[in-house]
């Protein structure tokens, strides 16, 4: 509800207002070095994340052929970026969209058309290079005006953006605190729930500490995932 804007401003922080009508752009395909757990292939995790975005858009229509095409394109798009030591510009969803349209399979064109609204269309705020600074010691993401169409997708991308920032700090030897107000909202969206729980487990390995704040404990206790989270947390 935008309550933190005065406090963030008073402390010289950065407030990032994320909505379909704002000029803010956050690249859903940003990927920092150390993205995967030790010894794991970062492309496997990134491919899974991008598949989650398409599953959020297309629902149960995403099948094994769609997933194979996404995985193939992700490997191609990131190959030079990773080979270059994660320097330069990350690929974008626009790059992925263009590559999908170049594939031979009908399913690739289905993926491109289904995601068009969120890539080249009017809701494409996560399909371009990130244009906001996220390196302030105090950074707040405001999703008040995100809207129902963008909310499920936006939650995934913002969590991904926060995770990338945690990785930057971890590699620089810095500790990160992540506070999520009204975090019961995340448990209304299955894919956001899954990602949120994964972050809850992984951040401690990256010298980061995550705090969830909610007044709706009763609502959350109806969720099996939320009950697991409470059982593995301090109060």
Feature annotation, model-predicted:
Residues 9-13, 18-22, 27-208, 212, ...:
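P-loop NTPase motor domains
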Residues 220-235:
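C-terminal regions of RecA-like/P-loop NTPase motor modules
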Residues 216-217:
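The feature captures the ABC ATPase H-loop/switch
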Residues 4-6:
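Rossmann-like S-adenosyl-L-methionine
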Residues 1:
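Glycine-rich phosphate-binding P-loop
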